[in-house]
Amino acid sequence: MKCAAAAPAPALEKDDLFAPYAKGVPKVTTVISEETKDGVKVTKLRFASAEGSKEGEVKDCEIYAIIARPANTAGQKLPGMLVCHGGGGMASEGGPIAWAKLGYVAIAPDLPGYGANDKMLSISRVTKMQFGADQIIPPKPTPYVCVLFDAVTAGLRAFNLLEAQPDVDPQKLCMTGISWGGYMVTMLSGLLDERVKGTFNLYGSGFYQLDAIGSDALKKMDEADRNTWLKCFDAGTRLNRCRATFLMYSAANDAFFKPPSVMATFDAIPVGKYICFGPNKSHYMSLPGGPVRWEYPINAEIEPAFFAHVLAGGNPPLPEPNAVAVTRNGKVLKFTVKNCPDRAAGWFYVSWLPDQPRGWEARDWAR
């Protein structure tokens, strides 16, 4: 499904806690190493960022990141890719190197607060915290107590650093993320508006208050705290500013980001958007284009083709299915497909609910 182009994004509110970090190139504090191998130059470094504290104050920190690019980019302007790791992950070189081999300049930062905190090479408060601590908590005395402030700020600063690279075309910036990284690219796409051209979200979502990881924690907060947390940290509240062409790959039986939150996220994206649900799997996509092998360094095999489509201005056009209104008799469902490729095949998956309600993870989808 794809929507018409939206109007220019509204300005980010001046008092938004992320406004100071949405623009401006962060200082590279340390270059740890540089190496060229197999036609790819890999730079490992730390850059200046910000983190919160138990006292609700903002402090300085340093974020570890890996930048990969083709070995010789002199005189070139290449597309840029921000690679966001998932929950329990950290910056790793596999993704950036894979994108560099496809002609991108790519950056993969630590995203402290939802990663492998104790293994990260960042200089951050979270390296002494357990994974999952202080993510979805009452924002008291200020929202800066929440470690998602650290993570989102690191993502913003990494994007700004990528955008400033001399061999990067600032008009061709994209981002990809898996799980919590899918949350991150959704959040950043809203905060960064027209600066992001294409976004791929594998399994993540916004609208945590509906049916996603952290929903129970949000329900336990009092209303004022919950509303503050959602305003500051829920990716769904940011999507009115998103202007990226968006592709969501989600699992219909996901245990973490379930269809109600995923569909609310999709509906809130005001511009070009596509979605695909994989049946009978949690946090895995079994359909063509998904992560069919775990050692694949890019999150899903459809990504290179999707981003090539975005950066080519939407060419060639992707298939767009549209439902056709028919008289319902329990057996007929019709749809048309615009831009349908030759020899295409289509099929339906249906979930029949029993008398007793069943959670999304336990549904059976029959083809």
Predicted regions and their residues:
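N-terminal cap/lid segment of alpha/beta-hydrolase-fold proteins
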Residues: 20-76
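Short beta-strand element of the alpha/beta-hydrolase
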Residues: 64-67, 76-86, 97, 106
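Gly/Ser-rich "nucleophile elbow"/oxyanion-hole loop immediately N-terminal to the catalytic nucleophile
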Residues: 72-76, 126, 131-178, 196
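Cap/lid segment of the alpha/beta-hydrolase catalytic domain
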Residues: 91-153, 205-217
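Primarily recognizes the serine-hydrolase "nucleophile elbow" in alpha/beta-hydrolase
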Residues: 102, 156-228
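Short beta-strand/loop motif that positions the catalytic acidic residue
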Residues: 242, 248-250
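Catalytic histidine neighborhood in serine/cysteine hydrolases
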Residues: 269-286
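Surface beta-strand/loop "capping" patches
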Residues: 306-347
